[in-house]
């Protein structure tokens, strides 16, 4: 198979108690994922940058009782290029790594840093990128001690990026690869988000497969989901409105959109088969069985065919 394991995500919030968590874990377990990707911010296990011991005990017991394997997705707001709160950003990442260790997760996904125009104007881009590299090396040391791999994820052109209020170098997967190559740490790799890359290719006009191919040797984890490759430039926040027009990061099951997933994966020369999280929007929770089946079918088809060089 193209992937060593195929799982899915649990992105619903459970910060007000734990009502529904055990039931949702059981529903996911019945769908047969190899793992479930959980978000510490949605489980309420981090408070002020540190693990909340009481909350961790409650949530951790439920996660372990479900007898599932896990990966972890760091809070979305973690930004290792934010020099104004750099210590706190590193604390949240490190707490996420320790949370992963507690629940037996081997992969921790972290978004690449972003430059916020108004806040970061007094810092050069290179200073910010250097700060991110240093933070990732430091976190990589901790990850290595804990037996965890950090996978840094590429992003997509959401509205603040399109407007120029935020600059995110990782919308070009090849630039993310350059940064992670420069980090040069065995516990730090890339999470290739295929849906994000497809949206970025459609908006910026780069070659989708070529850009993704630049990351292949560093990919440790994949976020696999589908969309219609149409950037959302409207101000409408409701996901239901985006779906009607097929806009933005829809997080559909593989095959429901227009991304050439099979073609891409046939051209990706992974040095080792990465884990694959079929990352669906919370509104599509009921489609997890379909999504897992589709991802496994793609993986089998790709593995059965001769790879195609880029």
Predicted regions and their residues:
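Histidine-acidic metal/acid-base catalytic patches
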Residues: 1-5, 14, 18-30, 106, ...
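Active-site-proximal loop/turn and secondary-structure-junction residues that shape catalytic pockets
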Residues: 12-14, 40-44, 76-78, 112-116, ...
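Short, basic/glycine-rich phosphate-binding loops at helix/coil junctions
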Residues: 70, 156-157, 241-246
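Flexible, glycine- and charge-enriched loops at secondary-structure boundaries
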Residues: 21, 49-52, 86, 90, ...
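Hydrophobic residues within beta-strands of alpha/beta enzymes
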Residues: 36-38, 108, 150, 222, ...
């Amino acid at each position: 198979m193209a992937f060593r394991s195929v799982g899915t995500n649990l992105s619903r919030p459970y910060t007000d108690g734990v009502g529904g968590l055990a039931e949702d874990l059981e529903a996911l377990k019945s769908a047969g994922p190899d793992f479930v990707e959980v978000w510490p911010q949605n489980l309420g296990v981090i408070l002020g940058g540190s693990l909340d011991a009481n909350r961790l005990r409650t949530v951790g017991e439920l996660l372990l009782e479900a007898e599932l394997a896990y990966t972890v997705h760091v809070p979305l707001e973690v930004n290792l290029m934010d020099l104004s709160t750099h210590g706190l950003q590193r604390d949240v990442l490190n707490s996420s790594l320790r949370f992963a260790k507690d629940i037996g997760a081997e992969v921790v996904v972290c978004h690449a840093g972003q430059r916020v125009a108004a806040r970061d104007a007094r810092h050069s881009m290179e200073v910010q990128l250097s700060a991110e590299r240093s933070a990732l090396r430091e976190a990589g040391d901790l990850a290595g001690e804990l037996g965890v791999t950090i996978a840094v994820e590429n992003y997509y052109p959401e509205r603040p990026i399109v407007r120029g209020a935020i600059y995110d170098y990782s919308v070009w997967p090849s630039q993310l690869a350059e940064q992670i190559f420069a980090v040069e740490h065995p516990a730090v790799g890339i999470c290739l988000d295929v849906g994000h890359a497809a949206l970025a290719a459609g908006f910026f006009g780069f070659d989708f497969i070529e850009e993704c191919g630049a990351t292949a040797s560093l990919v440790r984890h994949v976020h696999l989901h589908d969309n219609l490759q149409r950037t959302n430039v409207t101000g409408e926040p409701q996901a239901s409105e985006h779906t009607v027009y097929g806009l933005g990061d829809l997080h559909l099951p593989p095959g429901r959109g227009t991304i050439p997933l099979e073609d891409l994966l046939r051209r990706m020369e992974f040095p080792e088969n990465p884990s694959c999280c079929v990352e669906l929007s919370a509104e599509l929770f009921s489609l997890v069985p379909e999504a897992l089946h589709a991802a496994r079918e793609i993986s089998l088809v790709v593995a059965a065919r001769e790879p195609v060089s880029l």
